[in-house]
Amino acid sequence: MAAAATRPYDVLLVEDDIADAMLIQDALSERGTRNLTQVSDGIEALEYLRDPDNARPDLIVLDLNMPRMNGREFLAVVKEDAELRTIPVVVLTTSAAPDDVTGAYHHHANAYVTKPVNLEEFEAAVRSIDVFYLDIAVKPPREQGH
């Protein structure tokens, strides 16, 4: 793996498959992840993101095919939320269907990587996000009362 990001960062991993979650956790820890929180569906992810006691993640890694609220539905909600839509999202899924790829980018995704996970491709996606979102961009403060 290449050099870690210039600063540690927080990741929300939205993945229901334990083996995939462990693989991504290992890859991200090598990239400088400070805190990684894993949830198993979009509902849990939104609950985490909307809880004012939780740190706002610097990056969301999202599977599309999950129970309850899937990744497509989650992306649609995130895109409409002024606070959440600024968080970069890497979609990591088994689907290479053109509608899924186009839909993901239309609904906020910053990168799209297919499973089985090619760690080099995944790392390149995260690294491209590092350059702008983690090293250059300033995160907006969490609004009071949210």
Residue ranges and their predicted role:
Residues 62-63, 93:
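Active-site residues of response regulator receiver
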Residues 66-69:
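Receiver (REC) domain active-site loop signature in two-component systems and cognate sites
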Residues 117-130, 136-142:
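C-terminal output helix
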Residues 110:
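Short, glycine/charged-rich "phosphate-handling" switch motifs in NTP-dependent
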Residues 23-25, 38-59:
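Acidic, metal-coordinating helix/loop segments flanking the phosphotransfer/catalytic sites
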Residues 8-28, 45, 60:
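Conserved acidic segment of CheY-like receiver
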Residues 7-8, 55-59, 83-88:
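His-Asp phosphorelay/catalytic-motif detector in bacterial-type signaling
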